[in-house]
Amino acid sequence: MSKVCQVTGTRPGTGNNVSHANNKTRRRFLPNLHDHRYWVESENRWVRLRVSAKGMRIIDKRGIDAVLADMRARGERV
């Protein structure tokens, strides 16, 4: 399963680990993803989403119906 938030589209980023001796090695910064079920009252069903913590906050603020409408407008199957 890909490490991409379905709401925000956040993907892994890249950067460096930097040691005390200032040695640098490449690393990935992964988004804080969670598999979460949301109850959609209008459709009378559960929807499973893979969302980041920021995506959860967006759903709390705007509501699951508005977020699902935006996702469907982007062509994402939900």
Swiss-Prot record:
Q: Does the keyword Coiled coil apply?
A: no
> What protein does this entry describe?
Large ribosomal subunit protein bL28
Family according to the record: Belongs to the bacterial ribosomal protein bL28 family.
- Biased composition of type Polar residues is found at 1-22
Which UniProt keyword terms apply here?
Answer: Ribonucleoprotein, Ribosomal protein
Source organism: Halorhodospira halophila (strain DSM 244 / SL1) (Ectothiorhodospira halophila (strain DSM 244 / SL1))
Q: Which GO terms describe its molecular function?
A: structural constituent of ribosome
Q: Which InterPro entries match?
A: Ribosomal_bL28, Ribosomal_bL28/bL31-like_sf, Ribosomal_bL28_bact-type, Ribosomal_bL28_sf
Q: Which GO terms describe its cellular component?
A: cytosolic large ribosomal subunit
Ranges for region Disordered: 1-25
What gene makes this protein? rpmB
Pfam families with a match to the protein in the record: Ribosomal_L28
- Return one Gene Ontology term, BP aspect: translation
